[in-house]
Amino acid sequence: MVSIGMVFSAGGAKGDPFHSGVIAAIAEHTGFDSRDAELVVGTSAGSFTATALRAGLSPIDAEARHLGRELSAEGTAIVERIVTPYAEPEVKRSLLPSAPRMTLNAMLPPWKIDPARFAYGLLPDGKRSGASIAARIDELLPDGWPKRPTWIVAVRTNDGRRIVFGRDDVTGTVGQATQASSAIPAFYTPVRIGDRSYVDGALHSSTNADLVATLGFDLVIVSSVKTATADARSWRSDPERAWFSNKLDNELAEIRSTGTPVIVIEPDDTQLALLASGERVDACAAGRLAAERVLATSDGAGLRSIVESTG
């Protein structure tokens, strides 16, 4: 039986639309339905895509939802499970550093300072609550955690450690995990689960693709909106994207060192221009175009071959 793992990156409001365009294009051009992935890994916005797939929303409906098109009867029934309105109410917060321990840990041996964790620990907590995210995802998945492997990445505030909900021995509903994974530092309040607090998994990496390195998949597909193709990166004009791209390169090297092939779908200059508009429809189009560009190469032929071998 052929096994495919899928990784969905962080990306803010552009993330889920981009990923939806990617998976819709993959479905149309190769016949692979991302709902059939053996494992889905979601970081921040990518956790929305991962949970929607595990709820049964098809790639075509996922894209249609962002484009304002009519969904299938099945897709409509799934989306209508959500009854909680989306809201981001402001809450009182302290202006003291949110996680000084994390800042300290970022400077400890082996003396390779992690600038993201270092900076976050000095910032105050965010002042917006993302509680409606947890409620909505729990409504989308009323039976709780999906039966098929679903990993959602967050960062624990007290020590800066990466935590993988759905894999690690930690508590929390799938909705709480998604809220934690997308709790953007200094914007959203950290998410308290049990006696620990968590924030956005992108604080560690926008992709966290290295999590699948040793799992022995026949193929890994990474949809990454926060990185860019090598010719579209610039430390001068967009250091954050260059930073995340460098992190992803290292993760890909780790995966490939095990002999696992990887398909990476990320924006080039054309798609970056679309993403710059901030519109969901443009982010969706960017994801579709990025996927179609990659699928036109030998990577696409390889994926089609794998899909056909399972048919």
List PLM regions with ranges.
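Patatin-like phospholipase
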Residues: 1-43, 48-311
